[in-house]
């Protein structure tokens, strides 16, 4: 059948029909279920409500834009390093995020703010949806270059649901604290993508090996992503934190942790680099692990030193992961991890979760004072000891790994459905499969400006 | 005369003298008329004024930076797609915006805040000036590559005045609501530029056709502009909206609309694409129309579903416009629209205005409650019915199209003045006409690092 | 000895060991001395403290992100113009800033917030540390391409200390006002770097001349830096200014000054350009001097006209500096200034300091009213006359130039230590010395997608 006209037409229509179906279904669900919440609806909001308590909410607004910038500019450009896959990297980032934002508004709405037959949305819904889109884009990094856009939309369809359930179980059923999402975003997104990539393992991928590297200017584009992730990570971790000490502490810890992971990354990259030379892949990725590793604990009393130590550890572990573990992951575990999400999100996410276990276990009424209520409400209310909170945090990590692994496995099976359009082994990491691509250089017909011409214009 | 030394000197001096004259004249007018307003002047502001009402003002501050980012990064980089016109695209964006900001501060100041013989400026003046600069840059997109910098400055000189008057007529005389500027910014900027481009029609433009496309990495630079426009559009539409439900609703509606226009664009681009392949031009532009189409109505009770539907419609219409209408626009209507502003701003702007007519016509006291005063003050005060407001909105669109068309026509005649420097037909879309341009590649003399050399350094 | 295996190993280990040592030492000092301040510590912050006075603090949060964006995106990408040094430009920006942030937190902490045996850190510490990192990156611009990363870290180690002391002397001992840092950041950073570059003078640098220019797309990357600096400069100058009129005025003055410097730059660039063509180097740099020149005075009652005049002057002087003075600086004064920091930060910084002298000398109780206390507290309290404040401002400039020159000289001697790794004259401006660099173009083995292949995928 392959190559027959009808099949080709079917394949050509896959993406448009799926987009139209998903957008149509989402729109119908929005029409039936989604309503503005009381802080967004004209009729429910009153100027007289404008109190300090509401102030808290207004401050969210700039944070939302910071998170938004981080997800789109950051994740989008971090993936353009491939020499012939830049269109797909930023383009599919856009596509996936645009769908994930809508779909997770619905999923999270049903889980968290469904009452009176309606989901109630506001600025917080946007931030939560952006977080979920972040997890989907992390998974995208693992399968980058080896999947078509229709496959990716189906991946997002499944992953958004499991992300929402996992987050609900952790935050609401288990009382786990994870403000910046070391577990819910990074660990979940990374292992979901890695297991999925394992199921989609391509033994013949070396046919596309010559396209798997970067070129000089694609690495510079990638640094745009890196820098935006680096600068906005303090806002990302603090985006849903209540105003005041907690938000300041979260930003400060994240900032210190990133600074230390950067120095750790440079040290290790030069140490293990051929002839002492630095590797751009390490700087682009491992330097960011400081943001991941304090995702769970940045709101806690981690101390500035604790933030530095955590960031440094993450940066070094991640760099070593790129150098030594990624090749093993492919050769022994048959996991082809295009962007190295295991090193940027997987290991640092797990480390971050464990750091959260440790810091939670050390929490005392003395160290947190009145702030205990906002950081560990269940301890403050006497429902849990610090040790019990630590155990719950650990169990949360376990749950996340389960959801991610089972979900990634299911996702892999879904994406293997034979009628789905997937690039052949010899055409992975290649924009031309999905895009009309212009040449790399300007038209050869172009001539330099000649003096006669310059003189004759009107 | 052409080619004679004196003429060449005259042409060389055109840009510097115009810059110096415009800057000098602006500075004199600033010296005579512009003063800090009471929220900016040291002597007029008192700490005791620091009330909730003022809070509203402080919150503007981050929004100002968001709008600023959107106008400069967004519009600047959205136009670098041309393979040999990147310097001019970002450079002239800078030049035009820097002049438009000053000039529109004066024009808008005379129209809106002139009392006691002075214009009073503050943070709101900056946001309003940025909006006006946005409209000028939209018009720039229509004539991109076919006009010199001196011509562009003259275009801005005229357009800023007409923008100010049109906005004044709509918002102050007609009581039209247009928070995000579907009419005042997008429709006005697009049709001003399109009519101007019509007057400047070049029948021989195919002489520069080989330079009219993009190259691989120029398309990636363009995606920087796209992403920044996408992420900051919620702030752009909400920048001048009062705090509270209205601002949240504006951001939320814009966000949903953009998500839907993105999915609609991918669907249609793949559907009409050759061999089912996506076209980067569609993604770079049509995916943004969700922000344009809710410009008038995003503050209204559009409902989340309404935002999705509007965005989807705009994305699909815009994509179809790029595919089918832009060629007709050139061949039949003799409008050469370099960036396709008709598809990104023109049609979506008109659609957005009509959507505003519809949503305004459906406004009820029930749906808006206490919020009616801030969204439709004239309806709330009983001076107008919803239907009457809708009619005023429609008339506002008509006025905008008139101002834009007549203004664009006048602008075209102005730019055709024979002594103005304009690139010849064979040198359109070419940086070398205006800039000292380095080569595309590093010096051929460069040699790879040899081992002996590496070993001999101190 | 050169070229011997042991020496090569020693050189290879320099960067990793220095990174590890500096990170280790910083971490120990953090462990001993650094604590959260009362607005960041869970136990010290109380919800009941949430007053208007605190509000002031919360508003800092978005400004922090703006400053952060400006320092990293702005300075990082402004330096990628060199055709073969993009990795080092953004990479070492990252490295230097990550170290400077930590180290200046300690240095500034000891000088400003050391009590009870501890340094107390919060959001303001982050902004102050970012400012210091900015100065270090300015100095980096002077020596860009001619120094290795270990040398740069040592430079930062010294510069951060002197930056902190100079700032302390100016702001706390002399009562100098310098909100946006014309003196403390720009003048200090520039002359520190220039004197250092003088000490490191390389008579044989023409061996690397062929690598010293830009290529077409590296100039576009640089424009990313330029635009981010331009848009966030109002926030940068206003970041540590108290809320209210002062902050608005600072932003407004900076905005006007930048607009005028942009027009002045275009005018002069076209005027002095070969054949009337614009030079991208001028636009990338001189257009930004409007932000530098009002660094000292933007919070003062400069008036909108004053801001325009100052910006215009800075833009023209800076453009002329690039054209005429930079070559003399190298040939006569033996200062090799890679990025032209003398034109972007040096001269405009000194001009900004002198403008501050003038505006301070003209201060009257009438013009400032109640705002005098926040702008010139010592004049408001009657401890100083306006003339005396002006003299102190002038003396502050003198002190800054002293600290910068002596510091830069010491720094140069430090960096000349013979065992430090430095690129040879023939390998300056070359990434390959420090990085594993991929090719400029995609693998030649890559073939276009053939139809048979496209048809055979699963």
From Swiss-Prot, chains A, B, C:
The reaction(s) catalysed by this protein are: NH4(+)(in) = NH4(+)(out); methylamine(out) = methylamine(in); CO2(out) = CO2(in)
Q: Where in the cell is it found?
A: Cell membrane; Basolateral cell membrane
> Major location, coarse class?
membrane
Looking up Pfam families in the UniProt record yields: Ammonium_transp
- Topological domains on the Cytoplasmic side lie at 1-13, 83-86, 146-149, 202-219, 273-282, 326-346, 415-458
Question: Residue span of the signal peptide, if any?
Answer: none
Q: Which InterPro entries match?
A: Ammonium/urea_transptr, NH4_transpt_AmtB-like_dom, RhesusRHD
Topological domains, Extracellular: 35-61, 108-124, 171-178, 241-251, 304, 368-393
According to the record, the residues making up region (Interaction with ANK3) are 416-424
The Gene Ontology CC terms held by the record are: basolateral plasma membrane; plasma membrane; spectrin-associated cytoskeleton
Task: Summarize the protein's role.
Answer: Ammonium transporter involved in the maintenance of acid-base homeostasis. Transports ammonium and its related derivative methylammonium across the basolateral plasma membrane of epithelial cells likely contributing to renal transepithelial ammonia transport and ammonia metabolism. May transport either NH4(+) or NH3 ammonia species predominantly mediating an electrogenic NH4(+) transport. May act as a CO2 channel providing for renal acid secretion.
Please state what the protein is called: Ammonium transporter Rh type B
Provide the species name: Gorilla gorilla gorilla
Q: Which gene encodes it?
A: RHBG
